[in-house]
Regions:
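Secondary-structure boundary/capping motif
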Residues: 2-3, 38, 72-74
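Conserved N-terminal subdomain of the carbohydrate kinase-like
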Residues: 46-89
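Positively charged, low-complexity intrinsically disordered leader regions
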Residues: 1-19
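Short, glycine/charged-enriched secondary-structure capping and boundary segments
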Residues: 19-22, 63-65
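Short secondary-structure boundary/capping elements
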Residues: 2, 7, 28-35
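Short, flexible micro-motifs
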Residues: 11, 33-34, 57, 88
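Short pre-catalytic strand/loop immediately N-terminal to key active-site residues, enriched for Gly-Thr
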Residues: 20-30
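Beta-barrel outer-membrane channel/assembly domains of diderm bacteria
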Residues: 12-14, 26, 35-43
Length: 89
């Protein structure tokens, strides 16, 4: 089995929800290195993601989502008092 480690930053993505008024957003997460890790895992590669996140609820949700996609999270560092990056589209 192919083993891959992807290193990078994943960020929270806010996107205005279609068909809604201003101020309503859907939340996701993404980034080129995470997307690569997810697609490699879907193809059957043993994939780990190496990054740093905070110790907040959003970071917890990110890790749960990655694990659900089959991406290894054992190498994710947790930084007390920090938050993940955020961007809007």
């Amino acid at each position: 089995m192919t083993r891959v480690a992807c290193i990078g930053e994943c960020m929270i993505e806010l996107k205005q929800a279609q068909g809604t008024g201003a101020g309503l957003f859907s939340r996701g997460y993404g980034g080129d290195t995470l997307n690569t890790a997810v697609y490699l895992a879907r193809l059957g590669a043993s994939t780990d993601y190496i990054t740093a996140l905070g110790d907040d609820t959003l970071s917890d949700e990110m890790i749960v989502g990655w694990a659900a996609e089959g991406v290894g999270t054992a190498r994710v560092s947790r930084l007390p008092g920090k938050l993940p990056g955020l961007y809007m589209i």
